[in-house]
Amino acid sequence: MPPLILLLSAAHPPDDMRVVRKEGAALAAAGFRVLHLCPGPGGRLPPVAGVEIETLAAPSRRALWRPLWRRVLALRPAAIHASEPDAWVLAVRAARRLGARAVLDVHEHYPSRLDARLPAPLRPLARLALRAALRAIAARADALVHAKSGLAADFPGHPRQVEVRNHALVPEGLPRRAHGPGPLTLLHLGAIGVKRGWPQMLAALSLCPAKTRLLVIGRFTDGSEAAFRAEAARRGLAGRIELAGWMPAEAALARAAAEADVNLILFQPGEENHRLALPHKLFDGMALGLPVIAPGFALPVAEIVQGAGCGLLVDVTRPAAIAAAVAELADPARRAALGEAGWRAARGEWGWPGEAARLLALYRALLG
């Protein structure tokens, strides 16, 4: 039987795009047995992309630790691939107990996570403390995997670090948006909240032609849905907006391909993770052939949008700048040209296969 790689999550959903549909699927396709152990209703769920799914029910994230620990030890994996800092702790402890390999997946810039909760004078000290704690955990791991460029700087001296970025995963048979004349439908795909720019999104929509629509596919992650609805109503926009909620990936992409004309990425400045962001929604839109309106301050996003020529970079703090970009994309030929560039880039330089190859090379070196 092939060695078991355990994908360990303390917070990610059972069919998470990066953990399961990208990383796990790539490992399973290469012949490894892969299981995702994560929060959920409890028990086994149907496999996703060749990855076994096992969930543990708990009333809180902290209450999940002990069941996770017991189950990891019972499964006796050859490698534990952990996706959050609290899961990292479990992974390195369990790996030492079992003689397994521990791989820590660094999804974001964790030292800045407390910035929004602290007064500005305390933030540098908090970053130093968090960075020191994370380095201490990482020092006990066999390898670090980084979801975007720039994260390795927090772990100087670790001998085995690999970038496996969230580049475009293009499912077979993915529909492609056909661009034609008519009113535009703007798309926000994925998690949404105040810091992801919905106030600016609504203000920009109010500056667009009256038949311009907004389609939101995803969850509010900051509890602001009621405020969103109230602001939309205050601006007289409620009839132009559809909140479709969360959808499985296949359904979300099919809906976007059928209806959306422009992909919006409007997260706001002020957070290090926004500056370094490399969101799945960028690549999903590219894979569908949608032009994107994106923030110019987000360095990886700006590099891709400029390099691929697949959209417009704007000051996302200014609704007028967003609305002006929407007006530029009212021309179907312009949308089609930018969308075509993104469609090709998602299947070429910015596609997932190159990232998957680095992940597979790492695991082949670790497990032989």
Tell what function each PLM region has.
Residues 6-8, 145, 179-205, 215-216:
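Conserved donor-binding/catalytic core segment of Leloir-type glycosyltransferases
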Residues 12-18, 196, 249-257, 263-283, ...:
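Nucleotide-sugar-dependent
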Residues 25, 66-73, 93-97, 104, ...:
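Membrane-proximal helix-turn-helix segments that form the acceptor-binding/catalytic region
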Residues 39-42, 214-228, 245-246:
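Glycosyltransferase donor-sugar binding loop
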Residues 54, 127-175, 242:
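Donor nucleotide-sugar binding/catalytic pocket of nucleotide-sugar-dependent glycosyltransferases
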Residues 226-256, 262:
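Nucleotide-activated donor-binding/catalytic signature segment of Leloir-type glycosyltransferases, i.e.
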Residues 307-319, 326-333:
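Conserved acidic donor-binding segment of nucleotide-sugar-dependent glycosyltransferases
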Residues 317, 321, 333-363:
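A charged, aromatic-enriched C-terminal amphipathic alpha-helix characteristic of glycosyltransferases
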